[in-house]
């Protein structure tokens, strides 16, 4: 038991140190700063940004969405089994079967997606309502013609950047807490180390991409450092929570609430990935095949990590 506790404390420190290192590197190392880059250096950073977009895509689909769907399905199955115990007749079994087959996980993820959509729409309405509708329309459609065949496709509005960055950090924070919680709840040393290594690889890639993203949208060093520090603390906090409840039985309501929160976080993450990160990285038509390869490589990294996560 003492060995297991020591391993988990070591994992906690490793998560904190690695996350801080990976997140702060693209913020404070001048080589990663897009504003000062020219020529070949600028192209390399652009392709690196596409790779980070693939990492976000893989994290959203292969990790956050997959884990949310699995968790919600498992909790719904437990709920149906507990409520159908002792029931008689085929009608009750058929009703329970149809109850389980409903796509609750997809519904929760979609609710997270539409929640951020609504939040952003309200923010834009408040910001641009006094200026009239023409300003917003020109901002959104001024850079494109006839289904995007103009040479300068539209990119996401800069006014949306801070809000979407905040949504990205919040969704990642939720997910990081649950990742740390999973490590803290492991019952053996081998399982703890295996899961921690997978989380370290996943977290390192994602947080590096977050640091790169914060630098590209012009976030100040102090605010970017605060964001990375907050994100770095989430997995250790989750692991510490797992240590406190490891050995105690978790209630059904607690498990369902965790699964629902993971689903909402996955939906918000997918919204930011598809409507902010990918469009911004692919807006420039330069070297489209190279950008595709980098996005695919980033996704492949996360898909490979999913074998052990």
From Swiss-Prot:
Record-level GO cellular component terms: cytoplasmic ribonucleoprotein granule; cytoplasmic vesicle; plasma membrane
Record membrane topology: Multi-pass membrane protein
Keyword flag Ion transport: yes
Keyword Ribonucleoprotein tagged: no
Extracellular side: 1-8, 65-103, 186-191, 247-258
Catalytic activities: Zn(2+)(in) = Zn(2+)(out); Cd(2+)(in) = Cd(2+)(out)
Pfam families: Zip
Signal peptide positions on this chain: none
Biological processes per GO annotation: cadmium ion transmembrane transport; keratinocyte differentiation; zinc ion transmembrane transport; zinc ion transport
Entry comment describing in which tissues the protein is expressed: High expression in the liver, skin and ovary.
Subcellular location: Cell membrane
KO phenotype (gene knockout): Deficient mice do not reveal any specific phenotype, however these mice are more susceptible to abnormal embryonic development because of zinc deficiency during pregnancy.
Molecular function per GO: metal ion binding; zinc ion transmembrane transporter activity
Site (Critical for the pH sensitivity): 63
Binding annotation for Zn(2+): 175, 179, 202, 276
InterPro entries, alphabetized: ZIP
Induction: Up-regulated upon the induction of differentiation in cultured keratinocytes.
Cytoplasmic side: 30-43, 125-164, 213-225, 280-288
Regions crossing the membrane: 9-29, 44-64, 104-124, 165-185, 192-212, 226-246, 259-279, 289-309
Record keywords, A-Z: Cell membrane, Ion transport, Membrane, Metal-binding, Transmembrane, Transmembrane helix, Transport, Zinc, Zinc transport
Function: Transporter for the divalent cation Zn(2+). Mediates the influx of Zn(2+) into cells from extracellular space. The Zn(2+) uniporter activity is independent of H(+)-driving force, but is modulated by extracellular pH and membrane potential. Transports also other divalent cations Zn(2+), Cd2(+), Cu2(+), Co2(+) in the order of decreasing affinity, respectively. In the skin, aids in the differentiation of keratinocytes in the epidermis.
PANTHER family listed in its UniProt record: ZINC TRANSPORTER ZIP2, ZINC/IRON TRANSPORTER
Family according to the record: Belongs to the ZIP transporter (TC 2.A.5) family.
Name of the molecule in the record: Zinc transporter ZIP2
């Amino acid at each position: 038991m003492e060995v297991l506790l020591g391993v988990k404390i070591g994992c906690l420190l490793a998560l904190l140190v690695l996350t801080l290192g990976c997140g702060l590197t693209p913020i404070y190392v001048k080589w990663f700063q897009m504003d000062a880059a020219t020529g070949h250096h600028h192209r390399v950073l652009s392709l690196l940004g596409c790779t980070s977009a693939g990492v976000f895509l893989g994290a959203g689909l292969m990790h956050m969405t997959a884990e949310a769907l699995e968790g919600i399905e498992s909790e719904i199955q437990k709920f149906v089994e507990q409520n159908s115990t002792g029931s008689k007749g085929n009608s009750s079994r058929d009703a329970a079967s149809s109850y389980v087959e409903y796509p609750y996980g997809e519904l929760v993820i979609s609710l997270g997606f539409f929640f951020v959509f609504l939040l952003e729409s309200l923010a834009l309405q408040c910001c641009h309502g006094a200026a009239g509708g023409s300003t917003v329309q020109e901002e959104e459609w001024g850079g494109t013609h006839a289904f995007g065949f103009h040479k300068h496709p539209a990119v996401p509005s800069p006014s949306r950047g801070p809000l979407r960055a905040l949504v990205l950090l919040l969704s990642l924070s939720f997910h990081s807490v649950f990742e740390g919680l999973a490590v803290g709840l492991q019952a053996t040393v081998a399982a703890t180390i295996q899961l921690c290594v997978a989380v370290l690889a996943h977290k390192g890639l994602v947080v590096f991409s977050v640091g790169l993203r914060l630098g590209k949208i012009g976030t100040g060093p102090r605010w970017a450092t605060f964001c990375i520090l907050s994100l770095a603390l989430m997995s250790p906090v989750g692991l510490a929570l797992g240590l406190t409840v490891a050995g105690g039985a978790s209630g059904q309501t607690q498990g369902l609430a965790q699964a629902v929160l993971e689903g909402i976080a996955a939906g918000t993450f997918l919204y930011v990935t598809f409507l902010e990160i990918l469009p911004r990285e692919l807006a420039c038509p330069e070297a489209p095949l190279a950008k595709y390869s980098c996005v695919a490589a980033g996704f492949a990294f996360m898909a490979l990590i999913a074998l052990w996560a």
